[in-house]
Amino acid sequence: MDTKLILIEGLPGSGKSTTARLVHEILMQNGIESELYCEGDLNHPADYESVAYFENDQWHRLLEEYSAFRDQIIENCIPEDNGYLLPYKKLVPDIPDTFYEKVSKKDIYELPLDQNMKLIINNWERFSTRAASGKKYIFLNAVLYRILLQSV
């Protein structure tokens, strides 16, 4: 079996999450490898939930300004397209609120459209390459449609 991508779409409260969880659990109980990612999941492989993007100069200024948390910030960053991605909600809560206020302004969904689309397309290409090499079911709950709407 090749990897199967299953997108669950629907209106809020229509049973998307319940349906996705139920099918995922049935597959797993029957020994069929399956992954489930719901909207808002910080580990979602094809979404940038609470991820900021910084160009190199912005990144180095951020590290200087928050040098007390430098190691933790660097440990969680991902080099990307002449800059860095930072999944900022994955950082420990002892970082000051001013950090989160600053970083959330660089959230991928707050970037200019052309930059936003480039990062999202790169992420989907990476995701599809990884998924194609596997043999499992991957459920994405209501993310694709909203990502596309947010990107327009």
Task: Set out the residue ranges of the language-model regions.
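ATP-dependent NMP and nucleoside kinases share a basic, alpha-helical "lid"
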Residues: 104-152
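Active-site signature of alpha/beta-hydrolase-fold catalytic machinery across serine-
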Residues: 22
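P-loop (Walker A) phosphate-binding loop of NTP-binding proteins
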Residues: 11
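Hydrophobic positions on the alpha1 helix immediately C-terminal to the Walker A/P-loop
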Residues: 19
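Conserved glycine(s) of the Walker
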Residues: 15
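Conserved substrate/cofactor phosphate-moiety recognition/catalytic segment
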Residues: 25-74
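Phosphate-binding P-loop
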Residues: 1-3
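Hydrophobic anchor at the beta1->P-loop junction of P-loop NTPases
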Residues: 8
